[in-house]
Structures are given as C-alpha cells and as structure tokens.
A protein has these predicted regions:
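N-terminal lobe of the biotin/lipoate ligase/transferase fold
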Residues: 1-84, 88
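Long, positively charged amphipathic alpha-helical accessory segments at protein N-termini or as interdomain linkers
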Residues: 64-66, 70-90, 100-215
Length: 215
C-alpha cells in the first residue's frame, strides 16, 4: 500500500487517474495533496481545499460488495468503520457526506474509469468553509475534526490522519463489509426516524426517514 504525497495539484482524483494510466496505482494505493486548486465534490461542485485538511484519492477493489450496488454508500460505511476504529464516530448523510455532531466534516466522490474504482475523500481537519462559501440550500453547517473531537489532537494533522485511516480501510475484510454494510448504513444514517423533505427539481416530498433497502 503506497501513499503518493504531493504539495499541490488541481485534483487528487486527476493525479490518481494519471498514476493509474501509468500502472502506478494498485488497489488501496492512494494520493494525498496538501492543497487542491480545483477539488471537486458531488454534482461537479467545487470542494474548498485550504491547507491543513485531508484531500486524498484511493483505488478500491472491484470485488465483493464493490462489484455493484450503491458504491458511494458502501464506501461511506467502509470509511466510517475505519474512522470509528480510531475513535472518530460519524454519521452518514445520504450518501456522500460525513457528519459529526450535526456538522458536515467531510465528503466522498467515487469515479469508475478504465476498469478501476477510485474514491476521492475530503475531511475538514482544522478548517471549514465559511457559510457564504457553501451553496444556498445546504442542509448542514460545516465543521472540523478539531471542533468535533477536541481530544483527538493526533488526527488534526492530515498526513498522520491518512496514515491511520488508509491502513484501517485496507484492513477491513471485504467479506465482512459485504455482509454488514447495509445494516451499518441503516444505523449510521443521519435523521433516521425523523421527518425529512426531499427536493428533486420542482418536486418536493416530505416523510419519515425509516431506513434503507439494499436496492
């Protein structure tokens, strides 16, 4: 498992794709940058990437539960389990956001190209976007690991954090993940058993979020 570390890039996902094309990115190898100049999030949004936070891309195995299904949600559980093993307990907001004590602390973005699956991961270690930098309809404020877990100072450093998290991700059994991801996702789901409103274009629906189904 190799971590390719660089000071600055446009996007760690782009660097990972380049390494992949060169045959230099094996399963669970990753890229970490101190700063991204064009980090991207869900739906093509810009991911604010100041120095001091974690910006990584990791190649995932295309086997087990990663063969099919809601891959972003499966990886969110995979990452959440790795963080839990380090004492960082998070929730999942459907299906790309990581939440700590009511604030968004990170996000993921999966890309499947060239027969490989790569996960982009961003975690706010010490800095979070100002409210005016977030989209107008954001559902949660942004927060940081430093604010949410003040006693976990060892993980405020993004390189030390990724050293630990990447090792934990690689250590999770794919057989265990395949058997347990859905149940873990149900229990980690933010706003479970609460009233939520879903907006899809002009359509607005309100109901109680009771859980998830495999499909």
């Amino acid at each position: 498992m190799i971590i390719h570390r660089i000071n600055e890039c446009d996007s760690v996902l782009n660097v990972a794709q380049k390494l992949l094309s060169e045959g230099s990115l094996q399963v669970y190898d990753s890229v970490q940058a101190r700063v991204q100049t064009a980090g991207r999030g869900q739906y093509g949004r810009t991911w604010q990437s100041p120095e001091g936070n974690l910006y990584c891309a990791m190649r995932l195995p295309l086997e087990g539960c990663y063969r099919q299904g809601p891959l972003p949600l499966i990886f969110a559980v995979h990452l959440m389990c790795a963080l839990e093993n380090l004492g960082l307990s998070l929730r999942i907001k459907w299906m790309n956001d990581l939440v700590a004590f009511g604030g968004k602390v990170g996000g993921i973005l999966l890309e499947k190209k060239g027969g490989a699956l790569i996960a982009g991961i961003g975690i706010n270690c010490v800095a979070a976007p100002d409210p005016e930098q977030m989209r107008a309809d954001h559902a949660l404020p942004a927060t940081t690991l430093k604010a949410a877990f003040p006693d976990k100072e060892a993980f405020f450093d993004p390189e030390k954090l990724w050293d630990s998290v990447s090792a934990e991700i690689a250590a999770v059994s794919l057989d265990w993940l395949e058997a347990n991801w859905l149940e873990r996702a149900r229990h980690a789901l933010l706003w479970r058993n609460k009233e939520v409103t879903l907006r899809d274009g002009d359509s607005v629906k309100t109901g109680i979020l009771i859980g998830l189904e495999a499909d």
